[in-house]
Amino acid sequence: MLNKKAEQERIEKAYPFLRAAECLGRNLLHAMLMQIPAETVKTIYTIANLGRDYVREDIWYIPYDPLQVIGARRSKLSASLDRPQEELIRELLEQDDLRRWITRGLHVLRIE
């Protein structure tokens, strides 16, 4: 029971992050208004798509750390991205840029 509760808490923590990423990725106008670089928007959208796969397919296994999402979905990521894009995603996540942009997007888009 505790395990299931802990997993549910992880889902609840991850979902707003994924929702924000999806909205920022799709809403290019807001991204432009926030001066988010185009390459970052593309990266956010890619990660949002990977994250949505977790919500839909693996409801009880959503890693909170986006790097784990990328690691767990390596084959899918490799199929959709070339090597430089994959390195860009890792670099953005490691530098915390992606989280900063998403936090800013949450504020601007008023997603709760």
Predicted regions and their residues:
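A charge-rich, low-complexity, intrinsically flexible signal that marks solvent-exposed coils, linkers
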Residues: 2-112
